């Protein structure tokens, strides 16, 4: 969903164990490899070795059509990873139950967050949302109850 250390820290180990591919929105390429931007320099720098596949919009993987909807703000490449056929969204740190992701980090932007919130409000259909932290929620619940979505 994005390139911050708490979302990519185990990638090298997972790739070594499972020989899997790693996909990331193209706008977070620098975030993945730069310890200042992915924030790992605040704890233990990651020094990522995995080769990633950059994505702009859609991929097909294991029979799933997966949309990477770029919703910048938390990072430039933050995305909803959407499994449309199953009405599931992995939201990373874009949106949480009752909140949105921080926008005060390097590579973050309040202006982009506001634009992304407007995009989220325009998504039709109800989806089950699995955020990067905290409990799951639904898109309908967030449209009704999330104060950040309702302020704009």
Task: Indicate residue ranges for each PLM-predicted region.
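Metallo-beta-lactamase
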Residues: 34-42, 67-72, 76-152
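Active-site HxH/HxHxD metal-binding segment of metal-dependent hydrolases
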Residues: 1-61, 145-148
